[in-house]
Every structure is written in structure tokens, then in C-alpha cells.
Amino acid sequence: MAREKFDRSKPHVNVGTIGHIDHGKTTLTAAICTVLAKEGKSAATRYDEIDKAPEEKARGITINSAHVEYSSDKRHYAHVDCPGHADYIKNMITGAAQMDGAILVVSATDSVMPQTREHILLARQVGVPKMVVFLNKCDIASDEEVQELVAEEVRDLLTSYGFDGKNTPIIYGSALKALEGDPKWEAKIHDLIKAVDEWIPTPTREVDKPFLLAIEDTMTITGRGTVVTGRVERGELKVGQEVEIVGLKPIRKAVVTGIEMFKKELDSAMAGDNAGVLLRGVERKEVERGQVLAKPGSIKPHKKFKAEIYALKKEEGGRHTGFLNGYRPQFYFRTTDVTGSIALAENTEMVLPGDNASITVELIAPIACEKGSKFSIREGGRTVGAGTVTEVLE
């Protein structure tokens, strides 16, 4: 019998720095890399390398963000840092950089500021489960009473947004001093990583979640049935299993009689695969792009939901003017556009290009979605915004 291969891989966790401008997010990111590089657990990365974050596109939106990697004794981390406030908002709403947890940076000299609040609220809305606090600039604001007051304020704020403020770890440090190699402050970076290891939960791997495939195309194979193709978003599918076809039409069940990838027959397909799935007893006209194949009972179709959105600026290819209550664009979920109308929050009259807002959406046809589902807002095929479902209503 062949011996099982020794598995060296550590659990992979995605984190990111959040917090008010100039509170030290990028300096902390550089400090983590520099301190851990001394133990061979990261590549030393300079502040200016992180600060000139490259552009990337997610859901038709350009976002600047820097990605660094490091390891602790327990885990491997991918860490995202954004240069600008708008980049954070876009990043969280599009899910361009998925965050399993966050490191909230608060300057002990300033305490809680407007973007501190906004980032905590957004993290809550898009489902970041926990965060660790790094109270920065404690070398300057060295009065312990002042530090305690700031820590208390941060705990209260976290609690008010639904996080566990009472038990959230707070590390008192100085990112700049750690970056400069002062051993007293380097030790605080190790404390921070230990807190992240222990407080931020290991995410469920995509392959362990319930199966879901977004249908991109359909075809008939004479004598065998209907094949749907698309990317497996999560989970695993095996030949012989029953699936549900969800969205746009009433839910119907079907049995999988074959799976193909790159013209080869397979007995299973898993998260990340592009596969063709043969369905028994389903006619081609009964399935269409925009529906999903899913594990029975795991996802429901919805027409009405609440969402957090970002409206693109004119320079980003967005609208030139704001939109009002009742605006009817298309909502692009996974592989298809569905028209819907937007109801703004009570105290909002208009959403201007560059704004982020909480809205309620009512679609003309139900689509498979759940809390955390991402979508683009489009007008005539061009992206004018992006959003995350925060609550399904009906």
C-alpha cells in the first residue's frame, strides 16, 4: 500500500489592514513583513513597495491594493493593504480581496476617526467575522491612561457594530519603531501575529462548502441528455448525485449522469474546476445561463434583498450623474443580468458617483443568492457599481 504523502501545507487565511488614513496601516504591513523576514517567514517588503499598490480589476472596477504573504508557526497568510479609503470600500464590496479577518489599525494619538467607523461597519456588512486591533504610535502616546481610554473607545465601537469588543485582542505597539528594528516594538509584532493566529478563525475551505456551479452555457447531446457548463464555485459534485437547478424559474431537481473536463470523463468536479455536467431527464429549454446547479436545499432563489453598494465615479467609467429612488439598472449575478429597482435608505435622497450606500433591491426574476453574494450594477452592458448582499428579504 502506498504511503500517504506528508502534508506540509498550513491552513491558508486571508487578512487585511483596515482603519483611518495615516493611522499606520501600510507601515504596519511593512513592519510585519520585515520582522517576520528575520525568521524566514516572509519576504522583507519596503514601505514604498507596498504604498505603490498595483491596479487590479474586479467586477469591472479598478482597485489599487498591495498583496503580501507571510507565515506564522500555525498558518500561511495572504495580507492585503490598500492605499486609499475608496480602495478599501471597493475592495470590501467587490470581494476582490476576500478577508477572513482584519487587523484594525488605530492611532493612539488620534483614537477613533470617521474611517475607523466606516471600515468596521463595512467589515460587518460584508461578513468579516473577527478582527484584531493594533493600537499604533504607542511610542508617541506613551501615557498608559491615554492608551487605555483609546482601547476602551475601540472596544465600545466594535461592540456597537456587532463584534465581540470585550474579548477582541488589542496589541499596543509602534509599527514605525518595529520597522526600524527596535526589539521592544518588534516583540509587539510577534504578539500581533500570535493574536491573529488565535482569534481569527480558520475559514471553511471552498471545497468543503455545499456544491454550487454557475451555469454559463447549455447544450444537447443526442441520446444522452442536456449538458450545462460552468465553473464550480464551491464544494464538490460526484456522478450519480442529485442537484437542484435554481434561479429564474421554479426550482427543479435533476440527477447528474456524467461530468466532463477538457473532453475527459470524470467521476467528480470540485471548487475551481470548469466542467460540463450531464443532467438526466432535463430538456435544454428548461435550463439557461444565469441559473445555478446546487446541492439540494443549500441556496434559494430571491427577488428582494438589502445590499451595500459602491457607485463608480465618472472617471472610473461610472455614471456622470447620481441616481434617485426607483432607479432601474441591471444586476449582474455570476453569469447573467437581471433588471431590478433600487430603493434608497430613508435618509438618502440620491446616490452620487463615488458614494457607497445601503439599498434595497427588487429584481424582476428570482436569482440564487444569499448573504455575502456579490454583484455588479450595469447599465447597457457597462459597469456603474458593485455590491454585496447583506440580507435576503423574499
UniProtKB/Swiss-Prot annotation:
SUPFAM superfamilies per the UniProt record, alphabetical: EF-Tu/eEF-1alpha/eIF2-gamma C-terminal domain, P-loop containing nucleoside triphosphate hydrolases, Translation proteins
- Protein name, please? Elongation factor Tu
Family per UniProt? Belongs to the TRAFAC class translation factor GTPase superfamily. Classic translation factor GTPase family. EF-Tu/EF-1A subfamily.
Q: Where in the cell is it found?
A: Cytoplasm
Keyword hit for Glycoprotein: no
Source organism per UniProt: Mycoplasma genitalium (strain ATCC 33530 / DSM 19775 / NCTC 10195 / G37)
Q: Which UniProt keywords apply?
A: Cytoplasm, Elongation factor, GTP-binding, Hydrolase, Magnesium, Metal-binding, Nucleotide-binding, Protein biosynthesis
Q: Where is this region: G1?
A: 19-26
User: Among the entry's GO cellular component annotations, what is one?
Assistant: cytoplasm
Q: Where is the tr-type G domain?
A: 10-204
InterPro entries with a match to the protein in the record? EF-Tu_GTP-bd, EF-Tu_GTPase, EFTu-like_2, EFTU_2, G_TR_CS, P-loop_NTPase, Small_GTP-bd, T_Tr_GTP-bd_dom
Q: What does this protein do?
A: GTP hydrolase that promotes the GTP-dependent binding of aminoacyl-tRNA to the A-site of ribosomes during protein biosynthesis.
Which stretches of sequence are listed as region G5? 174-176
Q: Where is this region: G3?
A: 81-84
Q: Where is this region: G2?
A: 60-64
**Does the entry feature the keyword Protein biosynthesis, yes or no?**
yes
Instruction: List the molecular function annotations (GO) for this entry.
Output: GTP binding; GTPase activity; translation elongation factor activity
- Which stretches of sequence are listed as region G4? 136-139
Look up the EC number in the record and give it: 3.6.5.3
**Can you tell me which residues bind GTP?**
19-26, 81-85, 136-139
Q: Which classification does the entry list for the species?
A: Bacteria, Bacillati, Mycoplasmatota, Mycoplasmoidales, Mycoplasmoidaceae
